[in-house]
């Protein structure tokens, strides 16, 4: 029996989540809410995508609905989630991809509006975080509001899990070289909390903070306090890369590290982790649905306990795929 789902926030992640969910027979998207996007505009934004290409099916709008491949999806424009009629539409699960309602108190509004469970597509300081392939098995049905963490944590955590399980991680530093996102500026503009973040996105490499590495400690508790990192925003439209430099607890050759990642990518983490020895660049991973693709040729071994590891990720599409995977997992446990 299909689960009924509503999407709050029809931005980059919300639209890609819809694309991916439409390919899953066990998911029925019945409603979308975005206060800034009317049905006609929603259909246009869903149909055309500058990064991932045009939607392959039929898209139109009819009254208060968008129509995708003949199926109507109701569009609401409520600013406050408590006013979205999830209950009336029979919505059991809400994916909140606004980046605004990311804490337990604000996401609770979806429950108050009639939904049963909420998956937040952003890291949260109060909602429990889950990363598919890392700790989703710790989910219990009493948890009504959960977070899918960030795209970078979804790339880093599976790699850290593999390395920590096999060799142990004493400590590490991460840099993510990250594509442009919607919060950045097309030209220099005001950004009071992050002055550098207000500079022209297309013409600069912009250092930024990220909690992605520290968040690994929330999904892998034994790594709490052992990882931290930063972000460098670069002028590419999509696909990012994690540079993880770690001090190991056990001696390892680079070949042993490669073998451990390859074994996981072909076994228990297949579909979540990838492995490549090709001479790849970022655009080779556009619309890749994996969380973390280990670049065996780009890493550096300095000594038996000190290595640099590189992993690619489509920060839009790979992450959105995991959102849907986590939703399905939660539904299977309820």
UniProtKB/Swiss-Prot annotation:
Subcellular location: Cytoplasm
EC number(s) per entry: 1.2.1.12
Keywords: Cytoplasm, Glycolysis, NAD, Oxidoreductase
Amino acids binding D-glyceraldehyde 3-phosphate: 150-152, 181, 210-211, 233
Binding site residues for NAD(+): 12-13, 34, 79, 315
Annotated signal peptide: none
Annotated positions for site Activates thiol group during catalysis: 178
Major enzyme class: oxidoreductase
Pathway it works in: Carbohydrate degradation; glycolysis; pyruvate from D-glyceraldehyde 3-phosphate: step 1/5
Pfam families: Gp_dh_C (PF02800), Gp_dh_N (PF00044)
SUPFAM superfamilies: Glyceraldehyde-3-phosphate dehydrogenase-like, C-terminal domain, NAD(P)-binding Rossmann-fold domains
Keyword Oxidoreductase: yes
Example of a GO cellular component annotation carried by this entry: cytosol
GO molecular function: glyceraldehyde-3-phosphate dehydrogenase (NAD+) (phosphorylating) activity; NAD binding; NADP binding
PROSITE patterns per UniProt: GAPDH
Catalytic reactions of this protein: D-glyceraldehyde 3-phosphate + phosphate + NAD(+) = (2R)-3-phospho-glyceroyl phosphate + NADH + H(+)
InterPro entries: GlycerAld/Erythrose_P_DH (IPR020831), GlycerAld_3-P_DH_AS (IPR020830), GlycerAld_3-P_DH_cat (IPR020829), GlycerAld_3-P_DH_NAD(P)-bd (IPR020828), Glyceraldehyde-3-P_DH_1 (IPR006424), NAD(P)-bd_dom_sf (IPR036291)
Gene3D superfamilies: Dihydrodipicolinate Reductase, domain 2 (3.30.360.10), NAD(P)-binding Rossmann-like Domain (3.40.50.720)
One GO BP annotation of this record: glycolytic process
UniProt-annotated catalytic positions: 151
Family statement: Belongs to the glyceraldehyde-3-phosphate dehydrogenase family.
NCBIfam families linked: GAPDH-I
Protein name: Glyceraldehyde-3-phosphate dehydrogenase
Taxonomic source organism: Wickerhamomyces ciferrii (strain ATCC 14091 / BCRC 22168 / CBS 111 / JCM 3599 / NBRC 0793 / NRRL Y-1031 F-60-10)
């Amino acid at each position: 029996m299909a689960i009924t789902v509503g999407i709050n926030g029809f931005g980059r992640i919300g639209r890609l989540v819809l694309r991916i969910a439409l390919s899953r027979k066990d998911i029925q998207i019945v409603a979308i809410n975005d206060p800034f996007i009317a049905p006609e505009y929603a259909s246009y934004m869903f149909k055309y995508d500058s990064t991932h290409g045009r939607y392959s099916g039929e898209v139109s709008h009819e009254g208060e609905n968008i129509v995708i491949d003949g199926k109507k999806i109701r569009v609401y424009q409520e600013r406050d989630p408590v006013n979205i009629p999830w209950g009336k539409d029979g919505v059991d699960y809400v994916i909140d991809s606004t980046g605004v309602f990311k804490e337990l108190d604000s996401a609770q509004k979806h429950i108050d509006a009639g939904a049963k469970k909420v998956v937040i597509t952003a890291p949260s300081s109060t909602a429990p975080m889950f990363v598919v392939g890392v700790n989703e098995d710790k989910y219990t049905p009493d948890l009504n509001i959960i977070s899918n963490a960030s795209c970078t944590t979804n790339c880093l955590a599976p790699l850290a899990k593999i390395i920590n399980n096999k060799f142990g991680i004493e400590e590490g530093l991460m840099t993510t070289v990250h594509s442009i996102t919607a919060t950045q500026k097309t030209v220099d503009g005001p950004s009071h909390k992050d002055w550098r973040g207000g500079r022209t996105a297309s013409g600069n490499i912009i250092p930024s903070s990220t909690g992605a590495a520290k968040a690994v400690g929330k999904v892998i508790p034994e790594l709490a306090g052992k990882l931290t990192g930063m972000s460098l925003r670069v002028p590419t439209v999509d696909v990012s890369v994690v540079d993880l430099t770690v001090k190991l607890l056990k001696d390892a050759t680079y070949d042993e590290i490669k073998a451990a990642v390859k074994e996981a990518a072909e076994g228990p983490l297949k579909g979540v982790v990838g492995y490549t020895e090709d001479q790849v660049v970022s655009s080779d991973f556009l619309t890749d649905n994996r969380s973390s693709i280990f670049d065996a040729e780009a890493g550096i071994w300095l000594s038996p306990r000190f290595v640099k590891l590189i992993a690619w990720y489509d920060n839009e599409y790979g992450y959105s795929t995991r959102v849907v995977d986590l939703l399905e997992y939660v539904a299977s446990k309820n």
